[in-house]
Amino acid sequence: MYALVTLAWWDFRTVRPRIGAMPIDFLQPAEIVAPQLLGCTLTHGGVGIRITEVEAYLDSTDEAAHTYRGKTPRNAAMFGPGGHMYVYISYGIHRAGNIVCGPEGTGQGVLLRAGEVVSGESIAQNRRGERIPHARLAQGPGNFGQALGLEVSDNHASVFGPSFLISDGVETPEIVRGPRIGISKNTEALLRFWIPNDPTVSGRRGYPKE
């Protein structure tokens, strides 16, 4: 069920090696963009988080996507151009962040599931709680959003500034992909990507058995 992808930074569509840091093309499909985000740092609100776990959500063909039933006021940001934020309220309290992908109108995005706070840790601690261990500060979509200081008003904001800033893609030697978690539809799609053995990854049960 799981696939271990060993990379010298691969472009999944063209299967060609990428060497060094390179800008990410957010107009590509979410499934292509998602693994490229691993290792990148997203900065906002005085905090920088190195992304370690993501999930791709596709267009209206993906029953688990917020865009499955079409465009609404709540998910309108997902139908914007790639490279912009889509923030929604989860379980009535958490702010979960997604980066929109694909051409405008396609309704694709990548959910930011987990990461490591690499700058502004004192700010993230104040937002999350003074006694939260470092590895858990941005572990899980809601915690990621809280540590980063996400609000619904951040919808449509570009990840290229001024409020957000995403670093270029980086070399990631190994990436694991498997089913998304916390959903009830399209559960077998291998659209969750994470850095193996990273302590910040949220879906511990998603690791392959050794």
From Swiss-Prot:
It comes from the Bacteria. InterPro entries: Formyl_transferase-like_C_sf, MPG, MPG_sf. Keywords: DNA damage, DNA repair, Hydrolase. GO terms for biological process: base-excision repair. Its EC number is 3.2.2.-. GO terms for molecular function: alkylbase DNA N-glycosylase activity; DNA binding. This is Putative 3-methyladenine DNA glycosylase. It comes from Corynebacterium glutamicum (strain R).
